Swiss-Prot record:
Disulfide bonds: none annotated. PANTHER family: REGULATORY PROTEIN SSL2874-RELATED, REGULATORY PROTEIN TM_1690-RELATED. Belongs to the RemA family. This is Putative regulatory protein Helmi_20580. It comes from Heliobacterium modesticaldum (strain ATCC 51547 / Ice1).
Amino acid sequence: MDIKLINIGFGNIVSASRIVAIVSPESAPIKRIIQEARDRGMLIDATYGRRTRAVIITDSDHVILSAVQPETVAHRLSAKESVHHGDEATE
């Protein structure tokens, strides 16, 4: 099994296979998800004190805050997947 890791900013890395959603933090429902995760102790703040620009939701119900734009994280995720699929084609 090949573990794919995604850089979410400032040297913080998340397992790509565990990501369920990458969303923007502006909407009220996402703010509610963040607060509920904070209350449950399932919030991981990887912003280094900067503005939250992306909220990453994992399959373990952890909520990760990132200072990187959601589009950037999604691009890194899709780039990793295309590289991985390219490796399979050559095997």
